[in-house]
Amino acid sequence: YVSPENPLYERQNIRIEDIDLKDLVILSAGNCMRDQIIELCQAKRDMPSHYSFESGSLDTLMRIVDCTSCLTIIPEMAIEYIPADHHDRLKMLAKGATSRKIAVAVRRTYVKSSIIKALTDTIMANVPVAKA
């Protein structure tokens, strides 16, 4: 999700290496998506240990981007909640950089396996499969 004021706005696909990290707005500490974005960026290059903007919600991140020249990374599943008049701000990350891990962790002593199966089936049916 890229501000029209950001130099990357004109692109359709963005490489992680092209993101100016000082323009990246991320979720606050304790959010697994934040950790995955930091891991992704660190895999490509050194990432600073502090940020100017952090937030606890994707909606707030997008509002910050709307009022600045920044950008943020949002999951594909959030796109359906973005107003149509802001779809021009949606850009794809370059192929190969955009996967997330989803895990279901359960205690070994948990006996309601049918609930776990239903949850797992629901997740699998609703999460986009990574495109190779």
Please describe what each predicted stretch is:
Residues 2-24:
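Flexible hinge/capping segments at coil-to-helix
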Residues 3, 27-28, 51, 74-75:
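Thr-Gly-centered strand-to-loop micro-motif
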Residues 8-10, 23-44, 112-120, 130:
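Secondary-structure junction motif
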Residues 11-12, 18, 56-109:
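Beta-alpha-beta core module
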Residues 26-27, 47-57:
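Short beta-strand-to-loop elements that line the ligand-binding cleft
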Residues 44-47, 85:
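Short helix-capping segments at alpha-helix termini
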Residues 102, 119, 123:
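Hydrophobic "lid"/C-terminal helical patch
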Residues 124-132:
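Periplasmic-binding protein-like
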